[in-house]
Curated annotation (Swiss-Prot):
It catalyses: (6S)-5,6,7,8-tetrahydrofolate + formate + ATP = (6R)-10-formyltetrahydrofolate + ADP + phosphate. This is Formate--tetrahydrofolate ligase. It comes from Methylobacillus flagellatus (strain ATCC 51484 / DSM 6875 / VKM B-1610 / KT). The keyword Ligase applies. Its EC number is 6.3.4.3. Keywords: ATP-binding, Ligase, Nucleotide-binding, One-carbon metabolism. Pfam families: FTHFS. GO terms for biological process: tetrahydrofolate interconversion. ATP binds at S65, P66, A67, G68, E69, G70, K71, T72.
Length: 557
């Protein structure tokens, strides 16, 4: 079997202008970035806006094992399958962050014969959107310290500056730093730190804005810190939001690429789902819904994280209504959640599998009962999966009235996902009710945390230190109580302890910190030891990457 990068290099790509033309986009509606990448103008073909929206399909997953379950691969495979069946399909994905690319994950553009291409470009810089977002974020950071240095007319308290700097890399050494050392000429010394760019509020604003004007307004509302008297200071107070918008004027346009089977794919934005809201941009999703009859998108990590935020933040804000949900699972991950050791996941273990299916059952309950979406299970099959194991999963899901479809798109491309696509179409045809939210906007922030913790995570209680609870109450009293919440926690467990697999019982959600995102219009609830700046693993993927004598990238995936 060829590696992902070898498969991608063997592909015969079509010019992206041809893909755009088939979507109804003329040459004036796109900006080419070479032959195989383009950006779609925000005012592309005004007549498209009169088109009815297509059907929206969400792909999510169970709580991931360390190896991942193939959610992006399934999203691509399903889109290809729909296209093969004569449907006008468009795929919507997030852009990869280079932190995980060089860290633990490697490439993030699908896998096997279900990939988006050009794979190397997508994983390495792409069209420069993340660099633009980082520049806009760090411009604001520079203007904060510059304002303090030149007289501090706004009376910003350096001890209460909440706006960190960002880079698109995993670097634990930058989590806490001291800036302004070396004398008066270098500014006022204060504690600072770095987040990874996908955790930036600018990224969240970028992905939730519905126009360039809305982007500018949201950027202006970003709270960067507080004055000595406790009043919030915004990017607009610093007159930074206009220049920030200038840096993002091209990045805000959705990126158009293609799959190995030439299905159009829009990749735009990339917030993580464990430390941010985990969805691609509203602009890209809305554009895709006008261009295609069926739009396949994903939300990061498991259905407890990305899917919850997709529903409670993105869909609520943008007025989106998903028509069906695909929950991705693997036999090996279910055995992992049943207590099997990572080294033993390729061996049949009916006992571990039986226990681990509880994790899938909880995600099914969340999707169907709490989010109100009809669901199907896409079981990504591996060679070592046995018939007995497959039969057990199908039996347990059948008892819940949920169909399990064995998916083989990794090995067979769209042809391996046609059965999955056919069942998704059946779910859409039988759709009769709208999406449900986990909580109402009218509930208090603390009530919202409790709703998600108890309903979605199965927690028995929520705890927060007194200063954190006081900050939540302060935000409530300041008029931010109607905002949705964005819980930052580990992706590996329903609890805040990554080692507690399956469906932990009697666990408590512990809130460590809270962060206001007034531009994105949500409140981040940070739990336990989750980090907004990841670190590299002991053996990062960067170790195996290189350039050969022909200038070809090796070891990317």
């Amino acid at each position: 079997m060829f590696s992902d990068i070898e498969i991608a290099r063997q592909a015969k790509l079509r010019k992206i202008s041809e893909i755009a033309a088939e979507l109804g986009l003329n040459e004036d509606s796109i900006t080419l970035y070479g032959q195989y990448k383009a950006k779609i103008d925000l005012n592309a073909n005004p007549q498209l806006q009169a088109q009815p929206d297509g059907k929206l399909i969400l792909v999510t997953a169970i709580s991931p094992s360390p190896a991942g379950e193939g959610k992006t691969t399934t999203t691509v495979g399903l889109g290809d399958a729909l296209q093969r069946m004569g449907k006008r399909a468009v795929i919507c994905l997030r852009e990869p962050s280079m932190g995980p690319v060089f860290g633990m994950k490697g490439g993030a553009a699908g896998g096997g014969y279900a990939q988006v291409v050009p794979m190397e470009d997508i994983n390495l810089h792409f069209t420069g959107d993340f660099a633009s977002i980082a520049l806009a974020h760090n411009l604001l950071a520079a203007m904060i310290d510059n304002h303090i240095h030149h007289g501090n007319a706004l009376q910003i308290d350096p001890r209460q500056v909440t706006w960190k700097r960002v880079i698109d890399m995993n670097d634990r050494a930058l989590r806490q730093v001291v800036i302004g050392l070396g004398g008066k000429v270098n500014g006022q010394p204060r504690e600072d730190g770095f987040d990874i760019v996908v955790a930036s509020e600018v990224m969240a604003v970028f992905c939730l804005a519905d126009s360039l004007k809305d982007l500018r307004t949201r950027l202006g509302r970003i709270v960067v810190g507080y004055t000595y008297s406790g009043q919030p200071v915004t990017a607009q107070d610093l007159k930074a939001h206009g220049a920030m918008t200038v840096l993002l004027k091209d990045a805000i346009k959705p990126n158009l690429v293609q799959t190995l089977e030439h299905t159009p794919a829009l990749l735009h934005g990339g917030p993580f789902a464990n430390i941010a809201h985990g969805c691609n941009s509203v602009i890209a999703t809305r554009t895709a819904l006008k261009l295609g009859d069926y739009v396949v998108t994903e939300a990061g990590f498991g259905a407890d994280l990305g899917a919850e935020k997709f529903i409670d933040i993105k869909c609520r804000k943008a007025g989106l209504h998903p028509d069906a949900c695909v929950i991705v699972a693997t036999i090996r991950a279910l055995k992992y959640h049943g207590g099997a050791d990572v080294s033993a996941l390729s061996r049949e273990d009916m006992l571990a599998l039986d226990r681990g299916i509880a994790n899938l059952e909880k995600h099914v309950e969340n999707v169907t009962t709490h989010y109100g979406m009809p669901a199907v299970i896409a079981l990504n099959r591996f060679d070592h999966d046995t018939e007995a194991e497959l039969a057990l999963v199908m039996k347990r899901m059948g008892e819940m009235g949920i169909k399990v479809v064995v998916a083989e798109h990794w090995a067979k491309g769209g042809a391996g996902a046609e059965s999955l696509a056919a069942h998704v179409l059946q779910l859409i045809e039988g759709r009769s009710e709208g999406v449900r939210y986990v909580y109402e906007s009218s509930e208090t922030l603390w009530e919202k945390v409790n709703q998600v913790a108890r309903k979605i995570y199965g927690a028995m209680d929520v705890h927060a230190p007194r200063p954190v609870r006081a900050m939540i109450d302060r935000l409530q009293d300041a008029g931010y109580g109607h905002y949705p919440i964005c819980i930052a926690k580990t992706q590996y467990s329903f609890s805040t302890d990554a080692s507690r697999r399956g469906v932990p019982h009697e666990h408590i959600l512990t809130v460590r910190a809270v962060r206001l995102c007034a531009g994105a219009e949500f409140v981040v609830i940070i739990c336990d030891d989750i980090m907004t700046m990841p670190g590299l693993p002991e053996e990062p993927c960067a170790i195996r990457m290189d350039i050969d004598d022909d200038g070809q990238v090796v070891g990317l995936y």
